[in-house]
Amino acid sequence: MTLKIAIAGAGGRMGCQLIQAVHSAEGVELGAAFERKGSSLVGTDAGELAGIGHLGVAVSDDLESQKDKFDLLIDFTRPEGTLEHIAFCVANNKKMVIGTTGFDENGKVAIKAASDKIAIVFASNFSVGVNLVFKLLEKAAKVMGDYCDIEVIEAHHRHKVDAPSGTALSMGEHIAKTLGRDLKTHGVFCREGITGERKRDEIGFSTIRASDVVGEHSVWFADIGERVEISHKASSRMTFANGAVRAGKWLENKANGLFDMTDVLDLNNL
């Protein structure tokens, strides 16, 4: 049976990549595509919007009218929109892949609560390479973390609205958890003026916003006389889109639960 996928935010940069990824993947098909209420893109063919030709799927701004056309919703939009989509999916038993970042604690609690009813993959980054990096960071932190300074440096395009990136925060969380630290108290997100000497147990974050950078992350484990850097650079959003579709296919036989790309890629068994 073919898995029917809907895309939220179909007209955005990521939305168009997701349409392309669904169209090219085996075992899935594009069932619906959505934009915000009143968008000028409503009624446009999703395939033409994504530059791959006519698909016969018109962009809609009404999930209710399209609910019989999809089994799973992929959402890379904004937290407020995603939370509305979550409520709809819970009410209509639709699975979700969520790549939206910037949720506050209440938003994360809402996602966890929804996963009691439906199956959700929620990840800060759907790149296979980035999720492998998460595991490498845990290994490095275990060996070097208590003896070095740790800094997370990330760069994204000028249009990104949240900082640090969700991926950078996830990197920090993986490191902090490995070291038994709380990122809320050990994370340093701003340095300005006379800050005093750096504390050894800090996990620092630096953010760059410039031009059309798709996404770059680097973590330094810096000791006296040597430094280990673990980096990932994305050159195309298709890596995230393909990962999201892979996650959706993995969810097909799951009734409920909250998962991430570690589960999808079975990284805990490495």
Curated annotation (Swiss-Prot):
One of its GO terms (molecular function) is NAD binding. InterPro entries: DapB_C (IPR022663), DapB_N (IPR000846), DapB_N_CS (IPR022664), DHDPR_bac (IPR023940), NAD(P)-bd_dom_sf (IPR036291). Its main location: cytoplasm. The keyword NADP applies. The active site is at H156 (proton donor/acceptor), K160 (proton donor). The keyword NADP applies. This is 4-hydroxy-tetrahydrodipicolinate reductase. It comes from Haemophilus influenzae (strain ATCC 51907 / DSM 11121 / KW20 / Rd). The gene is dapB.
